[in-house]
Amino acid sequence: VQPRIGEVIESTTTAFTAGAYELLAAPPFGALVRAQARAEGMVVYGLVYEIRTGSKEPGGRALVRGRTYAGRELYDAEIYHEHPDLAEVLQTEFSAITVGFVEDGRIRQYLPPQPPPVHYSVYETTGEELMRFSEVTDFFRTLLFASQIPSDELLAAIIRSAARARAGTAGGERAYLVQAGREVASLLKDDYDRLTAILRRIRP
């Protein structure tokens, strides 16, 4: 059974935020994640567009820990090693834009009838699951026209990941990049500058 990586702490129709169970262990930017839904057999897919770590206290901020009162200097990972209590006072969270769901065993790349409930489990997807989801590219449009997220960077990241997942398969990595590039070109045919910027980001 695949271990869950966190749980939903905020949920809307178009996005959800999860708290990671391990400090600094969020899935990477652009990762496809899966949240459990209330309906039997339904899961909701999201793409991670923001990762943040901060104080668990509302309105609180992390304190400087790199220098002790005795003048000892601590750097980077040493700080976490010297202060294991940081895992109790800090929390890593990640937000994902909803790009589809599974219902009755079928992947649907539009918004689910209900968002995943707060406190429900969130999982990373496998390479096989990512390949299956990205076979259809309807979600490209969702990303390109989403507001308040780094949509172009996010689209490029998921295209690169989906292509890498196909390395060693019959179609292969390059074939997917070509297919994805054509789809992006058709969606952005009237915005050459934006199109070329995305194509540069997915170039192998």
Task: Identify the function of each model-found stretch.
Residues V1-T17:
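Short, basic/aromatic beta-hairpin or loop at an interaction surface
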Residues R4-I9, A31-L32, G41-T53:
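Short beta-strand-centered aromatic/proline hotspots
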Residues A15-A20, G54-R67, A96:
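Short, solvent-exposed secondary-structure boundary/capping segments
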Residues A26-P28:
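Short, well-ordered loop/turn sites that connect or cap secondary structure elements
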Residues E82-P204:
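Charge/polar-rich, low-complexity and marginally structured segments
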